Amino acid sequence: MIMRGESNTYIKVKSVLDNSTPEDAKRNKNLIYLFTLLKGSSLIIPLAYNGLIMHENILILCWTAFSVIYTVLSMFKVLDVLEGETVSHSRYIYLAYVFGNLIFALSIIFHIM
C-alpha cells in the first residue's frame, strides 16, 4: 500500500511547493514532512525486513543499518531546505549508497553473500 503511494510523493510535494509562496510552504512543512516520511518508510520497511531475515550475515545487517540511518537523515534535509538553508549532498556517500543498494539487491536475488 505504501509502495503504491510512493510514486505520487514527489508530484504532491512539487505541486505544494509550486503553488505556494515561501510563507505558505513553511506553514505546509508538516504536510511535506508526512509525504517524505511515507516515502522513507516505504524504503526502510523492506530493508529492515531483509536485514532481519538474513541476520546471519553481518555485512547485510550493517548495510541495512547504514541505509536506514542515511534514509532518515535525508528525510530531515527536506525540512532544512524549507527553512531556507542550503543543503549540500556528499556525492561519494550518495554513490556508495546507490551502488551498495544495487549490490545488496543482487546478493538477495542471486544469494551471493
UniProtKB/Swiss-Prot annotation:
The lineage of its organism: Bacteria, Bacillati, Bacillota, Bacilli, Bacillales. It is found in: Cell membrane. GO terms for cellular component: plasma membrane. It is a multi-pass membrane protein. The keyword Cell membrane applies. The chain crosses the membrane at residues 34-54, 58-78, 93-113. The keyword Membrane applies. Keywords: Cell membrane, Membrane, Transmembrane, Transmembrane helix. This is SPbeta prophage-derived uncharacterized membrane protein YosW.
